[in-house]
Every structure is written in structure tokens, then in C-alpha cells.
Amino acid sequence: MNKIDAFILFSEPGQALKTVNELQNYESINNIYLLTPENIKETIKGCGNIEIDTLYSSNTIKKIAQKAKSEYIAIYIKSTPLKFGYFALERMLQIAEDSCAGMVYSDYFTIVDGKKEYHPVIDYQQGSLRDDFNFGSFFLFNTIAFKKATKRMKNDEYKFAGLYDLRLKISQETGIVHINEYLYTEFEEDTRDSGKKIFDYVDPKNRQVQIEMEQACTQHLKDVGAYLEPVFKPIEFNKEIFEYGASVIIPVRNRIKTIKDAISSVLRQKTDFLFNLIVVDNHSTDGTTEAINDFKDDARLIHIIPDRNNLGIGGCWNMGVHHPKCGKFTIQLDSDDIYSGEDTLQKIVDAFYIQNCAMIVGTYQMTNFDLEMIPPGIIDHKEWTPENGRNNALRINGLGAPRAFYTPVLRKIKLPNTSYGEDYAVGLHISRNYQIGRIYDVLYLSRRWEDNTDASLDIIKMNEHNLYKDRIRTWELQARKKLKLKSL
């Protein structure tokens, strides 16, 4: 019956003792090992100690593989106490055996400020390549699958990407199974709003972490036949004739507080080409329509109210892009935001010709409603490289802003008719064949306020968003595999 070797973090000995006591209640537990940082010399009776450098390193993963002798490996990655539900560990073991999974994980409860909350997680897909995919804090591995994956890990030097590399390797040969049952309770340590957490990967202090994660993901794409070499289709910008050099598109619904600022920031632009502004007003009811009409005397403004009622943000974009007055380049501006200067459009259009790209992504600065800079400040996505950006794009959670497109390419691909992830989906699709260029000057001020769509999401909405983006990645991964097979 002793089928599991458990490995738990031993950074807080007092807290770890509670978890050890919990595990020792189960007959299925064979051995308990304490993953111990170098500076801790204590131990717990009945447990073995494994000295580690970091919890997520390749070295730690290999030490676990060497120590494990039972059929299954359990890993708990938090220092706070763990509490199982009734027969929960047996349930997890049962599903692991029945499904022949390489790894299983489950929904869980959290204790936040003394309050118990439900914390469902999402299913794992081929495209679940985010290194911050939430498996919870307790997961169970088939030991044979774990050891096979460890042997196939090509980099032994990861300090941060070892566990990520492991699960990618496991996913290549066996299933990663989500048990949508609440099997344990953990104590929440990161209580920031979702809108703050989503920018963790661009925090400069996390840069070395991101370099390792990119390396692990890139190797995974090579392993599964989805890696794309840095060879891109060239763009011939003079093949089609346009009346306007560029169009800014603003999809909007009920943004009476901000729409005038957004429109004004476009109309103030100074360029050496003709441009216009296409505002797709998705049946606003709060006075936004009337606010847009205040600019009707400016011939550059095209105000569209769709004749259909089923458009998301992506659908509004498609309507603007396919308007006969749309310019050669299509440039994004959200209705909450403004351009940082009067030369933004000129810089973007110049970059298309200099970099020969089908899409350009700029740099933006986070501000409050009064345009004062707030953390995390400037979002420049310097993790992007011309050589590997389109591969790493399958791992990160967004491409940045402002986004701009060569209109003929965008008209051909089109955006999904959604109000989340539509920009990411089309960016991935474009990057499959074309180079995406970058501008590292701040072009755009992104205002965060209570009505932003991702300012603070509940767990259900966050899961919905993450599941959809993983689906987008899955479809793109499949398309790239197909593309690679055609080239053989």
C-alpha cells in the first residue's frame, strides 16, 4: 500500500511539521523527504533531508528522481501547511492509476485572511505552455514517467526552469490530468489583484527566470516539431494602393469617461502621410456615441455603429479593417488609453518600412486615470528577440501594445470575434509566417482604472481567459507542426 514518496519544501520548519504530520496519516505514503535550503540544519523525525539550491532547479528535480523508490512521487511546493480532504490522497492516487497519467493535479481550497475560498484550476492542453500555469501546490507524478522525463532534460543548469522543463517533458509522452475535484486546502501567500499578477513576466527582476523559461520552451517546441527557424516571408508594401497611409481603429462601448481623450490623442498626430480614425461604436448607451459626435466636423473621423449586435472587440476590429477607407497600416488604440506624443503614428509607420514587418508592437507605460505612472511602469517586452520571438510568443501571455498591422495581411487573417485574447491570437498567426517588429520607445499610455477588463478578475473569469489563451496556443502549435511537416 506504500506507493508514494513525498517531497516537501522545508524552508519553514514549524510549518513543514504540520504538513509532515498530515502526510503521515496516510498508509499510501512510503517516505517523506524534506527539500532543504543550505542554511537550514534542522530535520523532522522520520523524514529524510535533501539539500537543494532552489526549489525549481534542474538539480533539485534530478535529486528527487534519484531518491524516489516508490511508484509515485508527490511534491508540495509551498511552505505553508497542507490539509487534505477526506480520502483525497487516495482519490488522487486512484485517478493517477486509472488514467495512466504522468502527472495529476486537482482543484483546491485556499485560506485567504482566514476565509476559505474555492480555487478551481483548468485543464492542461498541448498549448498550456505558460510557465506560470497554475497546477496548485500539490501534484502527483508517476515515478517511471518522472525519471524518464528527467533523463531527457537536456539542460542540467537551470536554476528556475527545472520543474517547468520536467512537466514539458512529461507532457510529450504521457498525459497531464486535471482532477476537477477539491482535494486539499492551502494557504494563499500572493493576494495581489489578477491585473497586477499578469505583468510578473515583464518585471526586470524576473529577467533571468524568463531567459531560462524561454530556453526550456524553445527546446520543447523543437522536441514536438513546432519550432520555427528565423526565416520570414518578406512584405511588399507597394503591391496595393491605399488612399490613406494609416488608420487608427478604436473599438468602444460605454467609455464616456475616456473616449474624448483617446480621439483627441489621435487627431493631434503629426505625420507626413494621410491618416484617419475609425471608431467602431458598439452600441454605447452611456453618452459615448454623443461624445464621438462632438468630433464629427473633423473629416478624418469615421464613426461606425455596426448594423449587428453580436460583435466582440475582435469583430469591431474586423469591421474597421475591412472599411473601404481603412489605410495601408492599421494601428491600435484602446478607448481607455492615449498616445504618449504627437509622433506615435509616424514612428510606427516608419518602423514598418525599416524592419519590413507585417506587425509592429510598441512600448507602453502604465498610468492611473490621472496619467501618473504606476507599477509596473514601462512595459517594453524586451524578452522579445527577432530570432526567437515567435517561438517564445507561445509561452508568454501577451505581445504588448500598441499593436499595428499591415492591413492586407490583417484582412486576410482576421481577428476572432471575442473580447479577450483576440489580439494575441492574430499576433501568433501573423508570427507564423512574418516577422513582428518592435519599438522600444514609449508610444502609449495605458490607463488602469476600475472599469478595465482585466483590472481585477475573479478566479472563474481568470480561468476562462487562461483556458481560451491556452486553446489559442494549442491551435497555433498544431498549425506550426503542420507547417513543419509540409516543409520536410
Regions found by a protein language model. Name each.
Residues P81, Y86-Y118, D343-P376:
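Conserved donor NDP-sugar-binding/catalytic core segment of glycosyltransferases
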Residues K3-Q15, Y26, P37, A246-T258, ...:
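A conserved hydrophobic helix/loop-capping motif in glycosyltransferases and polysaccharide synthases
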Residues E157-L166, S419-V426:
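Acidic donor-binding loop at a coil-to-helix junction in glycosyltransferase catalytic cores
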